[in-house]
Amino acid sequence: MSDDLNPGPEHLETEADFENRWNALLAEMETRFGKRPDLNALLLLIGVQELGQGVASFTKEQKQDLMHIATCKLFSLSGHYELERVDEDGWPHYKLLRPVPFAFLKEQERMLKWHMLEYFTTDFD
């Protein structure tokens, strides 16, 4: 993982601890929703939460937009994005502050997982 996305010494944890936290989150989501979510389902859930308009039917394009909102929200936790405005329909728009560093697929997945753990810990504790 890139240095500017590492959580810092106060958050150092073993890979096993990280995986345990991740699996605990998935288990909690499975308990709440009756199905174990994948990364895309969690991104969609976060996007719906950030939109704040409750459960609704969304088009395929809206679902992609919700996942983009989620990604921006997650990476705002590490200073890469900030909420710029909410449009007249209530959809949030984020401004890129600094690029998210290049990462291969496995690193990207780990970055998303780490940010999701932070999101659910910060926003739901």
Regions from the PLM with identified roles:
Residues 98-125:
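Helix-rich interaction surfaces within compact, conserved domain-sized segments
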Residues 31-39, 56-66:
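Structural motif
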Residues 41-54, 66-77, 114:
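Short, hydrophobic/amphipathic alpha-helical patches that form generic packing surfaces
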Residues 2-51:
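N-terminal low-complexity, intrinsically disordered segments
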Residues 36, 50-53, 73-86, 119, ...:
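Amphipathic alpha-helical interaction segments
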Residues 58-108:
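Amphipathic protein-protein interaction modules
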